[in-house]
A protein has these predicted regions:
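Cross-family detector of peptidyl-prolyl cis-trans isomerase
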Residues: 1-221
Length: 221
């Protein structure tokens, strides 16, 4: 498989009198998002992000399946995860399955960040040796994710608890996911408010005991 690197360079902090911090960059954007805490109280967190390249293709939603190249780092810039090849494993189901907690669902900050990007208009191409080549016209962004939009107090293999995260993402392709294959995109079967809190309608909640939200229930269209 072809090796892929995220080569965009970003200055994260002031390192000299002539190097400005990214947090003073006028292009830095912010997204306010609410999260329920352990007491079921909404707490607001801020996702900061920088769009390095908007992308030329399809817009993305938080309920899509996306093909991405990414690099995940801690604040000391140590890398805890990254894509190194082009393969089917680069496809990620952003929202996943809330009933089974399907592993493919992503952390809030990653999901909301990728949704700010457009995909490539050209897509992957085949090299003569059979490997895949990623296009260069997909959206590229850097996302600064507070722990409340990440893993919070749950440590991961290379991520200590309460760690803010940095993700650099290149979006190659996006698909409007239809998790229950009922012909209606999943994004149209959930409700997201202005601060990113999702509610999951259940059209037949009083009729059966399946306890499936509409986006996972083919009987709800």
């Amino acid at each position: 498989s072809a090796t892929t690197t995220i080569s965009e360079t970003v200055t994260f902090a002031t390192t000299s009198n002539t190097t400005a911090s990214i947090f003073n960059d006028s292009k830095l954007k912010r997204l306010e998002l609410d999260v329920y805490d352990a007491n079921n109280t909404l707490v607001r967190h801020t996702l900061y992000y920088l769009i390095l390249q908007e992308g030329t293709g399809t817009t993305t939603t938080i309920a899509d399946s996306v093909y991405v190249n990414y690099k995940g780092q801690l604040l000391d810039l140590s890398v805890f995860d990254e894509t190194t090849t082009q393969s089917t494993s680069n496809w990620i189901d952003l929202i996943g399955n809330i009933v089974t907690n399907k592993p493919s669902g992503t952390i809030r900050g990653f999901r909301e960040g990728v949704a700010q990007l457009r995909a490539s208009a050209t897509g992957l191409t085949n090299n003569s040796d059979g490997t895949l080549k990623a296009p260069t016209d997909g959206g590229v962004g850097v996302f600064f994710i507070p722990s409340g939009l990440g893993y919070f107090n749950n440590s991961q293999a290379k991520i200590p608890a309460y760690s803010p995260l940095i993700f650099t993402v290149r979006l190659i392709a996006t698909r409007r996911a239809d998790h229950d294959h009922d012909g209606k995109p999943s994004i149209n079967e959930i409700v997201r408010n202005e601060y990113g809190v999702i509610t999951y309608p259940d059209c037949d909640a009083n009729k059966d005991t399946s306890y499936l939200p509409d986006y996972l229930d083919a009987d709800c269209k």
